[in-house]
UniProtKB/Swiss-Prot annotation:
<feature type="transmembrane region" description="Helical">
    <location>
        <begin position="82"/>
        <end position="102"/>
    </location>
</feature>
<dbReference type="GO" id="GO:0009252">
    <property type="term" value="P:peptidoglycan biosynthetic process"/>
</dbReference>
<keyword id="KW-1003">Cell membrane</keyword>
<dbReference type="InterPro" id="IPR003824">
    <property type="entry name" value="UppP"/>
</dbReference>
<keyword id="KW-0997">Cell inner membrane</keyword>
<keyword id="KW-0961">Cell wall biogenesis/degradation</keyword>
<protein>
    <recommendedName>
        <fullName>Undecaprenyl-diphosphatase</fullName>
        <ecNumber>3.6.1.27</ecNumber>
    </recommendedName>
</protein>
<dbReference type="GO" id="GO:0050380">
    <property type="term" value="F:undecaprenyl-diphosphatase activity"/>
</dbReference>
<dbReference type="Pfam" id="PF02673">
    <property type="entry name" value="BacA"/>
</dbReference>
<keyword id="KW-0472">Membrane</keyword>
<feature type="transmembrane region" description="Helical">
    <location>
        <begin position="45"/>
        <end position="62"/>
    </location>
</feature>
<dbReference type="GO" id="GO:0046677">
    <property type="term" value="P:response to antibiotic"/>
</dbReference>
<keyword id="KW-0133">Cell shape</keyword>
<feature type="transmembrane region" description="Helical">
    <location>
        <begin position="13"/>
        <end position="35"/>
    </location>
</feature>
<keyword id="KW-0573">Peptidoglycan synthesis</keyword>
<comment type="similarity">
    <text>Belongs to the UppP family.</text>
</comment>
<keyword id="KW-1133">Transmembrane helix</keyword>
Amino acid sequence: MDFLIVLKALMMGLVEGFTEFLPISSTGHLIVFGNLIGFHSNHKVFEIAIQLGAVLAVVFEYRQRFSNVLHGVGKDRKANRFVLNLAIAFIPAAVMGLLFDKQIKEYLFNPLSVAVMLVLGGFFILWVEKRQSRAEPKIADVDALRPIDALMIGVAQVFALVPGTSRSGSTVMGGMFWGIERKTATEFSFFLAVPMMVAATAYDVLKHYRFFTLHDVGLILIGFIAAFVSGLVAVKALLKFVSKKNYIPFAYYRIVFGIVIIILWLSGWISWE
């Protein structure tokens, strides 16, 4: 394999892992970064691999929690409620995604939509953070979440179907808006990423498996490992960060990044193929 291509695959995996769980849109970063470094591998298959690497980072980080839940389902009330909440939160975006996947990719997968959603999302984060600073959150533990809380987070996740919104951003801010404490909303967003991204990966595999070739295996493995490692670092770092600080820095970053996308697009530095 060409060293430069390997380096680019490594960089793309790192970008996916670092941005997937931050409220800054991994999709926007992958497209912009991919264009800037000229990475043109078997795009969809590679994207599936690095997304899977990122989600497995969450599974690894919370392996004890998931193990306890799996062993406790049907026997333990706490485990049953956890699974029920994940299922409830999963359904809205899954249904809407299946119904409108084609339309979303046809009409909203463009630089302007991504940039606008990044900027709007940034202002929404600022508003939600200001709102929560004025009132004590009602829920401060994932195990205290009720089905209605999970449903509200699931409804918020629907907005993440629009590129540039950010799945983690919509679920965390949706939870905080509903009165869930910042770190609790962040943890539940991590947990919800597992069924959501596994389902999305399975769906994409069924649609694009015929494009997979043995020639791509090396690059896919490199991207997968890079996304797993960087995703693990991002999850640990974000939890530590939100334990002491808020999401306001990410809000300003989104606003600036959205403007940068417009500038790069208008100047011809990035395309959307």
